[in-house]
């Protein structure tokens, strides 16, 4: 039975030791976190006025990369948005930007005004464009729910893992020789398997480096759209649905083959 032990956790970061799982399962979770978690991101911009030096296309591109808070519990499932089972307006949020510079001014992400208080820029101090006196920007931006497999602006988090290293130091001098690579040679959270193997090249037979095939150090870091716990729960929901859909399709195909044979 797979087991996870949390080593470090903050609202936006989690590190855990996973035991008793196949690499394929751990990697599947990693891939879902990276490319399939749904988040809100600006996808369409209507520019009413832009007298700044920045092209409309570049301005829209910058707005698209501004991370937005995403209250998953208050939004439809991403699958319903993608298949049209819900009204598109339920998966879309409008944001406004109207700035008339009375003096030199930098426009920040925090200047975007959302029609929903729970969908706003995660970080208010992202610079978008600089205006000089007399210049203005008026636009409407429409954010929608999407996934990173379509575009990186919808990426919610990063995730990775490595095999849990088993390190045995036969010569204490190795710790000093490898301190620039691993400050704590025998600490699996400080010294990853790859770093330990680099030390093995330095120390030779004085250092034994092995790994546990079914034990991993796994970490997740959220970009702030939602916390890391929400990211993991959503990743497991999506992965579970993939398994369920696969079994359903396989059962239907198997049933049709039996009927054809009869």
Curated annotation (Swiss-Prot):
UniProt xrefs under Pfam families: RNA_pol_A_bac, RNA_pol_L
Subcellular location field: Cytoplasm
Catalytic activity: RNA(n) + a ribonucleoside 5'-triphosphate = RNA(n+1) + diphosphate
Enzyme class, UniProt record, top EC level: transferase
Superkingdom per UniProt: Archaea
Keywords: Cytoplasm, DNA-directed RNA polymerase, Nucleotidyltransferase, Transcription, Transferase
GO biological process entries: DNA-templated transcription
One MF term in the entry's GO annotations: protein dimerization activity
InterPro entries reported in the protein's UniProt record: DNA-dir_RNA_pol_30-40kDasu_CS, DNA-dir_RNA_pol_insert, DNA-dir_RNA_pol_RpoA/D/Rpb3, RBP11-like, RNAP_Rpo3/Rpb3/RPAC1, RNApol_insert_sf, Rpo3/RPB3_RNA_Pol_subunit
Catalytic activity, EC: 2.7.7.6
Entry keyword annotation includes Nucleotidyltransferase: yes
GO cellular component, one term: DNA-directed RNA polymerase complex
Main location: cytoplasm
Record function comment: DNA-dependent RNA polymerase (RNAP) catalyzes the transcription of DNA into RNA using the four ribonucleoside triphosphates as substrates.
Binding partners and assembly: Part of the RNA polymerase complex.
Similarity annotation: Belongs to the archaeal Rpo3/eukaryotic RPB3 RNA polymerase subunit family.
HAMAP family for this protein: RNApol_arch_Rpo3 (MF_00320)
PANTHER family, alphabetized: DNA-DIRECTED RNA POLYMERASE, DNA-DIRECTED RNA POLYMERASE II SUBUNIT RPB3
Name of the protein in its database record: DNA-directed RNA polymerase subunit Rpo3
Organism field: Pyrobaculum islandicum (strain DSM 4184 / JCM 9189 / GEO3)
Gene name of the record: rpo3
